[in-house]
Amino acid sequence: MTSEQTFIAIKPDGVQRGLVGPIISRFENRGFKLAAMKLTSPSRSLLEQHYSDLKEKPFFPGLVTYMLSGPIVAMVWEGKDVVKTGRTILGATNPLASAPGTIRGDFAIDVGRNVCHGSDSVESAKKEIGLWFTPEEIQNYKLNAFGWIYEKE
């Protein structure tokens, strides 16, 4: 199995609303492996780096302020096509366009309070993981369930 990693963050609204467990369960139930996780209060500098591609957008200052408003659960998930599938699990950025059964479709209404963030490409995932985690914080272990989830190649 060819495995990749993605960065998923539960935003302050998701933490405050007690959605950490249900969100983690969605990824575990799908068959992905949790490789790193921490509850953190990021710096303004980290958030500005993380969202650097949105720096020129009018909503950027409000986004950074919102992300500073409470703790965030930062995670690295691993598995086959986890970036693409992770985005599907999250749902559309705008919760009103998200299908029922997705995290945002089930738990969010406003785009500015859409509960979580997920990397949009393998390249973005590598960048984001490098911003939020040191290599030592990412666990490399065998998840025995992978043998029951993936066909042998």
Swiss-Prot record:
<keyword id="KW-0067">ATP-binding</keyword>
<dbReference type="InterPro" id="IPR034907">
    <property type="entry name" value="NDK-like_dom"/>
</dbReference>
<keyword id="KW-0460">Magnesium</keyword>
<keyword id="KW-0546">Nucleotide metabolism</keyword>
<feature type="active site" description="Pros-phosphohistidine intermediate">
    <location>
        <position position="117"/>
    </location>
</feature>
<keyword id="KW-0418">Kinase</keyword>
<comment type="function">
    <text>Major role in the synthesis of nucleoside triphosphates other than ATP. The ATP gamma phosphate is transferred to the NDP beta phosphate via a ping-pong mechanism, using a phosphorylated active-site intermediate.</text>
</comment>
<protein>
    <recommendedName>
        <fullName>Nucleoside diphosphate kinase</fullName>
        <ecNumber>2.7.4.6</ecNumber>
    </recommendedName>
</protein>
<dbReference type="GO" id="GO:0006228">
    <property type="term" value="P:UTP biosynthetic process"/>
</dbReference>
<dbReference type="Pfam" id="PF00334">
    <property type="entry name" value="NDK"/>
</dbReference>
<keyword id="KW-0479">Metal-binding</keyword>
<dbReference type="GO" id="GO:0009142">
    <property type="term" value="P:nucleoside triphosphate biosynthetic process"/>
</dbReference>
<dbReference type="InterPro" id="IPR001564">
    <property type="entry name" value="Nucleoside_diP_kinase"/>
</dbReference>
<dbReference type="GO" id="GO:0005524">
    <property type="term" value="F:ATP binding"/>
</dbReference>
<feature type="binding site">
    <location>
        <position position="114"/>
    </location>
    <ligand>
        <name>ATP</name>
    </ligand>
</feature>
<keyword id="KW-0808">Transferase</keyword>
<dbReference type="GO" id="GO:0004550">
    <property type="term" value="F:nucleoside diphosphate kinase activity"/>
</dbReference>
<dbReference type="GO" id="GO:0006183">
    <property type="term" value="P:GTP biosynthetic process"/>
</dbReference>
<feature type="binding site">
    <location>
        <position position="104"/>
    </location>
    <ligand>
        <name>ATP</name>
    </ligand>
</feature>
<dbReference type="GO" id="GO:0046872">
    <property type="term" value="F:metal ion binding"/>
</dbReference>
<keyword id="KW-0597">Phosphoprotein</keyword>
<dbReference type="GO" id="GO:0051211">
    <property type="term" value="P:anisotropic cell growth"/>
</dbReference>
<feature type="binding site">
    <location>
        <position position="87"/>
    </location>
    <ligand>
        <name>ATP</name>
    </ligand>
</feature>
<dbReference type="InterPro" id="IPR036850">
    <property type="entry name" value="NDK-like_dom_sf"/>
</dbReference>
<feature type="binding site">
    <location>
        <position position="93"/>
    </location>
    <ligand>
        <name>ATP</name>
    </ligand>
</feature>
<dbReference type="GO" id="GO:0005576">
    <property type="term" value="C:extracellular region"/>
</dbReference>
<feature type="binding site">
    <location>
        <position position="59"/>
    </location>
    <ligand>
        <name>ATP</name>
    </ligand>
</feature>
<dbReference type="InterPro" id="IPR023005">
    <property type="entry name" value="Nucleoside_diP_kinase_AS"/>
</dbReference>
<comment type="similarity">
    <text>Belongs to the NDK family.</text>
</comment>
<keyword id="KW-0547">Nucleotide-binding</keyword>
<dbReference type="GO" id="GO:0006241">
    <property type="term" value="P:CTP biosynthetic process"/>
</dbReference>
<feature type="binding site">
    <location>
        <position position="11"/>
    </location>
    <ligand>
        <name>ATP</name>
    </ligand>
</feature>
